[in-house]
Amino acid sequence: MGKIANGVYPVMITPFTADNHVDWKAVDQIVEFYAKLGCDGIFAVCQSSEMFFLSEEERVQLAARVVKAAAGRMCVVASGHISDSIEDQIRELRRVAATGVDAVVMISNRLAAKDESDDVLIANMKRVLEAVPDVPFGMYECPHPYKRLLTPKVLEAMAETGRFQFIKDTCCDAKLIAERVRLLNGRIQLFNANCATFLETLKDGADGFSGIMANYHPDLLVWLHRNYQKQPEKARELSAMLSVMSLVEGCGHPAAVKYHMNLLGIPMELKCRMIDAETRFDRLDRHAIDDLLVMEGVVREWLKR
């Protein structure tokens, strides 16, 4: 199977209306924002999308809507299997695949319980692959409900199937990512989720970025991905700025992203299902996001020099 585009893939948020329905107009506007700022793809129906708090119908509708809004301008990948049983997960993944996404994303922690072995994960992974044929897959080390990092044994098993296009890595460890890149040897793409290590992992062969901060300033991450070899000194300086700016990830995500989107002229409620935005995104958090917006403008002007 072919590869998805390398580059920057925001982990897309899900906007909600005041009465707790998906805000489809805002969904379309977010996709336009990603396209305008040069994103190579979108990871829809992920943890940042609050997928564990979406109904099955909402997950399927969201994947389909993002595919339609992207209109071939960007790759769209999506997950959405949150059930406990593999049978139910297969049903969920089949429905996501039918929306026309470029790849369906498995979640490592859904394939085996925390106390179960890699052999269980691999067996369940193969069951899914057999039940959902002719569909390209990715694998996501989703932190919720527990983070299950992919071992070399699992990575090799994935590569041997020939069905996996990419990994959304969340180990946040540059050394481990370099080891994974060497093990995979081009058989599966690897997308880093961590700004602080992004540049280092690009140099070691990673294929792109898929993380929270691509919701704020994807164009800066796109610049780094496309120019780190041509302008290494400037890339190093930009990497340092992005690393510090990424500290806002702790400011009440995903409410903070929704607040930032409003500042950019994309209106939406701050309402979230996975957190209480009123208590988890406070006055100081808003101040930090206000300052981030200023910093983004400063960095963009600096890049033009």
Model-derived segments and spans:
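Catalytic alpha/beta core domains of metabolic enzymes, predominantly
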Residues: 127-132, 142-251
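C-terminal alpha-helical cap/extension of soluble enzyme domains
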Residues: 7-13, 37, 217-305
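Short secondary-structure capping/turn micro-motifs that flank functional sites
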Residues: 50-51, 112-113, 175, 199, ...
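Active-site beta->alpha loop and helix N-cap motifs at the rims of alpha/beta catalytic domains
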Residues: 2-149, 300-303
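Soluble or luminal CAZymes and related metallo-dependent hydrolases
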Residues: 26, 58, 120, 172, ...
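Ser/Thr-centered flexible coil motifs
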Residues: 55, 151, 279-282
